[in-house]
A protein has these predicted regions:
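Intrinsically disordered, low-complexity regions enriched in polar/acidic and amide residues
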Residues: 4, 22-23
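N-terminal signal peptide c-region/cleavage motif recognized by signal peptidases
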Residues: 17-19
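Extracytoplasmic copper-binding redox domains, predominantly the cupredoxin/blue-copper superfamily
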Residues: 23-241
Length: 241
């Protein structure tokens, strides 16, 4: 039989949880990737926006291990899917090989540095993204393969769709630093887009964010800092480093 004081404590906890949920809001934004002063790109996907409290409050993201689906970057048809993956810090990301040949996934520049070595079709490798950062992912065999993994120490983030729509659900009202990342933009441009915003109850919107696209990307090097062995693909390019 449940004791009366236990019921009181349980009721209080449920009430507090309900109030917390009621105070959360969905933040929305629309992004436009600008190829020129007046020309918009047709595809505005893969723009990442995230929020961090300005008062230094640490918000623990949900560990990937507590999710039913582990994050993964699949290798298929000599490409990574998805091209941009955002994960909480502490996530163990899977890199399954779905192609009928070997891959050698690596990242040496920013963010997490690793070399998974050669592994065959049907096998997988894991990487722990244990600190915040942006990791540029390549294959040492196939120059045309590239992807980005962004590890964040906040649960408040969203990724734009092709129309440029961004949704960040479950945000607690308060003051935040809003940061933006886009693969085709220069770092200085993205840095200037960082700003403080206030999230209130109900719903909040940032309106339209215009992101100037940079110059065409340059070729990247292989795992050993050398050019890829010919024949090279038609467009073995990447924005960073």
């Amino acid at each position: 039989m449940t004791k009366p004081h236990s019921l009181i404590v349980l009721t209080a906890l449920v009430t507090l949880a309900g109030l917390a949920c009621a105070q959360q809001t969905t933040v929305t934004a629309t992004v436009a990737v600008m190829n020129g002063k007046k020309t918009k790109a047709r595809d505005a996907s893969n723009v990442v926006i995230w929020l961090t409290p300005t008062d230094g409050t640490v918000i623990s993201p949900l560990p990937a291990a507590q999710s039913f689906l582990r994050p993964r970057l699949v290798q298929k048809d000599k490409s990574f899917e998805p091209h941009v993956l955002v994960v909480p810090v502490g996530s163990l990301v899977q890199f399954p090989n779905r192609d009928p040949f070997f891959h050698n996934v690596f990242s040496l520049f920013e963010g997490k540095r690793f070399d998974l070595g050669l592994y065959e079709a049907g096998s997988t490798r894991d990487v722990l993204f244990d600190k915040p950062g942006i990791s540029y992912i390549f294959c040492n065999i196939h120059a045309e393969m590239s992807a980005v993994v962004i590890a964040l120490n906040t649960p408040y983030y969203g990724i734009s769709d092709r129309r440029g729509q961004v949704l960040i659900p479950g945000v607690t009202p308060g003051r935040y630093a809003m940061r933006v990342w886009y693969e085709g933009a220069l770092p200085d441009t993205l840095s200037m887009m960082t700003k403080e915003i206030t999230v209130s109850g109900g719903s909040s919107t940032f309106g339209l964010l215009r992101i100037p696209a940079a110059n065409p990307p340059q070729e990247h090097k292989n795992l050993y800092g050398r050019d890829y062995t010919p024949p090279s693909p038609a467009n073995p390019t990447y924005v960073h480093p």
